[in-house]
């Protein structure tokens, strides 16, 4: 009788543990809050854009990033950024200093490495240059021809800078080691465990 009760209690404990740890999630709001905090504490975050022939040498300072999660196409992370871009542009043999506000938008997937969540496979969907000066027009024309290089620079940046770290409490830290899959849903990231 006692053995039966012990087995029943052990089975119940295992069931409760497994059902409580089947998945964990991070909401879009939590993700955006973490990104905003990271941008505040780790500035300046600069993405360098340089062409081999040195016609362009720009630094992109990330001021703001807003993340929108969607289930579309198997799960996407859509990011709208506000940045300041500054540097030099060589036009007709003349170096021209420039500064403008650049607002790129892109979509990507996610990967987890240890306890860090990274954006992967960033694909630009839109780039807006704010302003209407001559240098802004030249920047628009130059960026149009630099689409692939700009996309690669964004992808490289987010491949090494996590957007979220699973370290907010002991349960999150422990669960991070057991994540087997990530599912992007509308408004949350689900971490599948076991």
Please place each PLM-identified region on the residue numbering.
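Bacterial N-terminal signal peptides that target proteins for export
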Residues: 1-9
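Extracellular/lumenal and peripheral-membrane lipid-interaction modules
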Residues: 21-194
